[in-house]
Regions:
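Rossmann-fold cofactor-recognition segment
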Residues: 44-55
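SDR active-site strand-loop-helix element
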Residues: 7, 31, 67-70, 109-114, ...
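C-terminal substrate-binding subdomain of Rossmann-fold SDR/epimerase-dehydratase oxidoreductases
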Residues: 190, 194-320
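Conserved Rossmann-fold NAD(P)-dependent oxidoreductase catalytic core, especially the SDR/UDP-sugar
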Residues: 95-137
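Active-site helix of classical SDR
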Residues: 141
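NAD(P)H-binding glycine-rich loop region in Rossmannoid oxidoreductase-like domains
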Residues: 53-89, 100
Length: 320
């Protein structure tokens, strides 16, 4: 399985994933709008298609063995900005992609869903068996996309991943996700602003996210397998926002002030990832590793306060 198609391969996760897979001698086709910039390095085994996923056609998937579907309107604020765009990209384009994949006899399909599809849960162990109760346009669209894909599982080797909030460096950086935003605030302003603080959020390092894709890329499963062998949580550190702030300050070894502000957003999310661990996947990094990596890149001036690092700001500026 050497020919990999990655939708959204120019994004925060995709940019790192592409470079890692190229090291393993995969041939990669990336389809992306590159709304947030193109940071992919030229490579003889990399083909770039600058195109909106909604406009994908059959020829884009010629001779493809596996699709890794990353493209989406990501996070709650960005998705709420234009609900129609969110549903068109996250659901309808996913429907189009899976149909073309089956018509082109693609063997494997790996989908980047979200750990937020569970909604607000009181359970301490949020496992894959729990009922999905999404509360935002973003996680509702991810849930429906999952259901669309599951209706095709008899026809393709399907894996659905539900990652927690990802942290760590990427050339296509994001400063609108928890650990990254708090770390940047500490480095840039010597201030960590926390809203609420008691909310629990699951975390996943970029390193482990990339390794998870590589893990499932190498695994061969039967079509129409059970949900237990199809859907996997990927979240390994369930932490309060205030705890994150304290660990960031300790990891950076600076005396940043932690400013706690009131908020109406008291949502807490937890994830249990025992299922994927039982399959043989093991996380290798902690949030401290991501924090230290961000510090290094900040000192190298590879992370600055750039508009494209905030997804909602960029979407407001462009006409889609």
């Amino acid at each position: 399985m050497k020919n990999i198609f990655i939708s959204g391969g120019g994004g925060y996760v995709g940019t790192n994933l592409v470079q890692e897979l190229l090291k393993d001698d995969y041939k990669i086709i990336v389809l992306d709008t590159f709304w947030f910039g193109n940071y992919l390095k030229k490579n003889k085994n990399l083909k770039i298609i600058k195109k909106d996923l909604r406009n994908i056609n059959k020829s884009d998937l010629n001779n493809i063995d596996c699709i890794i579907h990353l493209a989406s309107i990501a996070n709650d604020p960005a998705a709420a900005l234009d609900a129609k765009l969110t549903w068109d990209v996250n659901v309808l384009a996913t429907y189009k992609l899976i149909n073309l994949a089956i018509n082109q006899e693609v063997k494997k399909f790996i989908f980047a869903s979200s750990g937020s599809v569970y909604g607000i849960k009181k359970e301490k162990k949020v496992t894959e068996e729990l009922t999905l109760q999404p509360i935002s346009e973003y996680n509702k669209s991810k849930m429906i996309a999952e259901r669309v894909l599951l209706s095709y599982k008899k026809k393709i080797d399907l894996t659905i991943l539900r990652p927690a909030t990802i942290c760590g460096y990427s050339p296509a950086m994001r400063l609108d996700v928890a650990i990254n935003a708090l770390t940047f605030g500490a480095l840039q302003n010597n201030l960590i602003t926390v809203y609420g603080g008691k909310q629990i959020r699951p975390n996943l390092t970029m390193h482990d996210m990339i390794n998870a894709y590589k893990f499932f890329l190498k695994r061969s499963f039967k079509k129409n397998r059970s949900t237990e062998n199809t859907i996997f949580n990927l979240g390994f550190e369930n932490l309060s926002i205030l705890n994150m702030a304290k660990r960031i300050r300790k990891s950076l070894q600076i005396n940043s002030k932690i400013l706690v502000k009131k908020t109406n957003d008291l949502r807490s999310y937890r994830q249990n990832s025992d299922r994927v661990i039982k399959k043989g996947f093991k996380p290798e990094k902690k949030i401290e590793d991501a924090i230290k990596e961000i510090k290094i890149k900040f000192l190298e001036k590879k992370i600055i306060n750039k508009e494209s690092y905030y997804r909602i700001n960029t979407l407001k500026m462009i006409k889609v």
